[in-house]
Amino acid sequence: MELGGPGAPPPPLLPPLLLLLGAGFLPASSPVETRAHAEERLLKTLFSGYNKWSRPVANISDVVLVHFGLSIAQLIDVDEKNQMMTTNVWVKQEWYDYKLRWDPADYENVTSIRIPSELIWRPDIVLYNNADGDFAITHLTKAHLFHDGRVQWTPPAIYKSSCSIDVTFFPFDQQNCTMKFGSWTYDKAKIDLVSMQSHVDQLGLWESGEWVIVDAAGTYNTRKYECCAEVYPDITYAFVIRRLPLFYTINLIVPCLLISCLTVLVFYLPSDCGEKVTLCISVLLSLTVFLLLITEIIPSTSLVIPLIGEYLLFTMVFVTLSIVITVFVLNVHHRSPRTHTMPAWVRRVFLDVVPRLLLMKRPSVVKDNCRRLIESMHKVASAPGFWPEPEGEPGVVSGERSRGPSRSASFRGPRDEPAEPQPACASPSDRVPAPQPSEGDPGSPCPLPDSCRPPPSTRAPGLTEARSLSFQHVSSAAERVEGGVRCRSWSIQGCAPQDEAASVAGGPVTSSPAFPKASAAELLPPDQPSPCRCRCRKEPSPNAVRKACGTRVPARHLPLSPALARAVEGVQYIADHLKAEDTDFSVKEDWKYVAMVIDRIFLWVFVIVCLLGTAGLFLPPWLAGMI
């Protein structure tokens, strides 16, 4: 059967329907795929015949305006020794390229694309004051291209810029570091810079633990260099950064202040303890070790001396002077009359004037210990119950004490006394003298020789005070019956010339601490009668008392036994020795007090200097507004 003939069935409608259905159910191309194809077509269109080496200007005389900005991400380090600042920044650059324009309607409404920055023209902006590394940007990120020809490029960079570090007020210093950006090839007639912002963007800044950015302002400058006749523009950002001083205050300043305080305490330490020089040397050694540790902390620059370096030098001189002064004070402290003689001006200045100015009061102690001992002995000897009395007999005063400035008891034998002048005997007593008979008194059973009448205060010129010793003897009952008079005491007196007494250590006469015990038989030989018979109980008349107080007795008329002479010599030696020791002790105490006054002077001087040095450390940075 022929197709299309009469009576033939109509052709099937399946293929056209299938075609229609297939055309209706076919997926249309996605917008992303369409945009990708549009960007691909756009890139092919833009870069066909594009030359990245030529400036993007339609006229050769036109200027490419590059908008420049800076955003800092982190202040990495400030190297005071090498004088450079390391920063992590984003360099913002924006310019127009007329060869990279298109109509978004022709390319599926594509308004911007990201393209590799190596494919387009870029301004050769570098960091002028680069200290280490590359001057230009090394990491070339993609640029953002807009349909109107605007190009935005923000590559990150780590710069090490040169920075003039001024460590005068270290660690309270504030630095001013700059970063200078500009075109290295094109002058102002080809490329001009326009600042995006007047300050550095710090929104994404990572805070540093040592520095804080106070200010970061950018300024536009033009400069004509010696190499070229053209004028070159640049944008300079000035970073004002301030150091955080907490670390250096704890680890540097506080130890220095404590060492200075230890140096001051050296002058408060007593010299007798023997640790003054040890403390000084210990402080000096600790300061030396401390200086070895902080050499890595202090900026090692020779342009200026840091303030903390000056303070450390001041502390070192401080400690050294304290050692020198301590040695001098110890020398003064250990002086004695056998090695040094104290000048009058030293005694006047350091024992009288300076202590009053320093409000120092010396304790009023009795220096003559031997004199106090003898005075106490005299008080005991003068007590009413000291001398024994027989029964039924009233007590008779027989103890004699010298009223002179030196209350001492001593003896001088015939071999010790000079021939001339003749000394006068004096035996004053604190009590009423015992009754003594006179020659004119017929009722006196016991006549008193003229040689036994001691005057109370008579003394020949050029003589020392009389020294007397009384010995007590109680008569027996047979003696009282035979003689009729009870003799109780004998008094032996002797004097020494003034020139002989003055030759003993040149000081006041000191007292002997003890008397030798002797009986009446040892005082005088048995075959020689005593010139002084006894003291009688009869009350004397006023004339007899006056005569007894005015009679002079030569010392050579008083004979001494050998045992008593040896005892007297021993007592005299002990008295002279104690007197010399007491004099030496007094002078030594004066030297020690002079040393203490010198210590107190330098204590206040060093305290004032330490306070002034500490104020000098903190005051200049505070006045400069850095604290």
Curated annotation (Swiss-Prot):
<feature type="signal peptide">
    <location>
        <begin position="1"/>
        <end position="31"/>
    </location>
</feature>
<keyword id="KW-0407">Ion channel</keyword>
<keyword id="KW-0732">Signal</keyword>
<feature type="disulfide bond">
    <location>
        <begin position="163"/>
        <end position="177"/>
    </location>
</feature>
<keyword id="KW-0325">Glycoprotein</keyword>
<feature type="binding site">
    <location>
        <position position="80"/>
    </location>
    <ligand>
        <name>Ca(2+)</name>
    </ligand>
</feature>
<keyword id="KW-0597">Phosphoprotein</keyword>
<keyword id="KW-0479">Metal-binding</keyword>
<feature type="disulfide bond" description="Associated with receptor activation">
    <location>
        <begin position="227"/>
        <end position="228"/>
    </location>
</feature>
<dbReference type="GO" id="GO:0042734">
    <property type="term" value="C:presynaptic membrane"/>
</dbReference>
<keyword id="KW-0564">Palmitate</keyword>
<feature type="region of interest" description="Disordered">
    <location>
        <begin position="384"/>
        <end position="463"/>
    </location>
</feature>
<feature type="transmembrane region" description="Helical">
    <location>
        <begin position="311"/>
        <end position="332"/>
    </location>
</feature>
<keyword id="KW-0406">Ion transport</keyword>
<comment type="function">
    <text>Component of neuronal acetylcholine receptors (nAChRs) that function as pentameric, ligand-gated cation channels with high calcium permeability among other activities. nAChRs are excitatory neurotrasnmitter receptors formed by a collection of nAChR subunits known to mediate synaptic transmission in the nervous system and the neuromuscular junction. Each nAchR subunit confers differential attributes to channel properties, including activation, deactivation and desensitization kinetics, pH sensitivity, cation permeability, and binding to allosteric modulators.</text>
</comment>
<dbReference type="GO" id="GO:0006979">
    <property type="term" value="P:response to oxidative stress"/>
</dbReference>
<feature type="glycosylation site" description="N-linked (GlcNAc...) asparagine">
    <location>
        <position position="59"/>
    </location>
</feature>
<feature type="modified residue" description="Phosphoserine">
    <location>
        <position position="427"/>
    </location>
</feature>
<dbReference type="InterPro" id="IPR036719">
    <property type="entry name" value="Neuro-gated_channel_TM_sf"/>
</dbReference>
<feature type="transmembrane region" description="Helical">
    <location>
        <begin position="601"/>
        <end position="619"/>
    </location>
</feature>
<keyword id="KW-0106">Calcium</keyword>
<dbReference type="InterPro" id="IPR006202">
    <property type="entry name" value="Neur_chan_lig-bd"/>
</dbReference>
<keyword id="KW-1133">Transmembrane helix</keyword>
<keyword id="KW-0812">Transmembrane</keyword>
<keyword id="KW-0770">Synapse</keyword>
<keyword id="KW-1015">Disulfide bond</keyword>
<dbReference type="GO" id="GO:0095500">
    <property type="term" value="P:acetylcholine receptor signaling pathway"/>
</dbReference>
<dbReference type="GO" id="GO:0050890">
    <property type="term" value="P:cognition"/>
</dbReference>
<dbReference type="GO" id="GO:0006281">
    <property type="term" value="P:DNA repair"/>
</dbReference>
<dbReference type="GO" id="GO:0005892">
    <property type="term" value="C:acetylcholine-gated channel complex"/>
</dbReference>
<feature type="transmembrane region" description="Helical">
    <location>
        <begin position="277"/>
        <end position="295"/>
    </location>
</feature>
<dbReference type="InterPro" id="IPR018000">
    <property type="entry name" value="Neurotransmitter_ion_chnl_CS"/>
</dbReference>
<feature type="glycosylation site" description="N-linked (GlcNAc...) asparagine">
    <location>
        <position position="109"/>
    </location>
</feature>
<comment type="similarity">
    <text>Belongs to the ligand-gated ion channel (TC 1.A.9) family. Acetylcholine receptor (TC 1.A.9.1) subfamily. Alpha-4/CHRNA4 sub-subfamily.</text>
</comment>
<comment type="subunit">
    <text>Neuronal AChR is composed of two different types of subunits: alpha and beta. CHRNA4 forms heteropentameric neuronal acetylcholine receptors with CHRNB2 and CHRNB4, as well as CHRNA5 and CHRNB3 as accesory subunits. Found in two major stoichiometric forms, LS (low agonist sensitivity): (CHRNA4)3:(CHRNB2)2 and HS (high agonist sensitivity): (CHRNA4)2:(CHRNB2)3, the two stoichiometric forms differ in their unitary conductance, calcium permeability, ACh sensitivity and potentiation by divalent cation. Cells produce predominantly an (CHRNA4)3:(CHRNB2)2 nAChR.</text>
</comment>
<dbReference type="GO" id="GO:0045211">
    <property type="term" value="C:postsynaptic membrane"/>
</dbReference>
<protein>
    <recommendedName>
        <fullName>Neuronal acetylcholine receptor subunit alpha-4</fullName>
    </recommendedName>
</protein>
<dbReference type="Pfam" id="PF02932">
    <property type="entry name" value="Neur_chan_memb"/>
</dbReference>
<feature type="topological domain" description="Extracellular">
    <location>
        <begin position="32"/>
        <end position="244"/>
    </location>
</feature>
<keyword id="KW-1071">Ligand-gated ion channel</keyword>
<feature type="compositionally biased region" description="Low complexity">
    <location>
        <begin position="384"/>
        <end position="399"/>
    </location>
</feature>
<dbReference type="Pfam" id="PF02931">
    <property type="entry name" value="Neur_chan_LBD"/>
</dbReference>
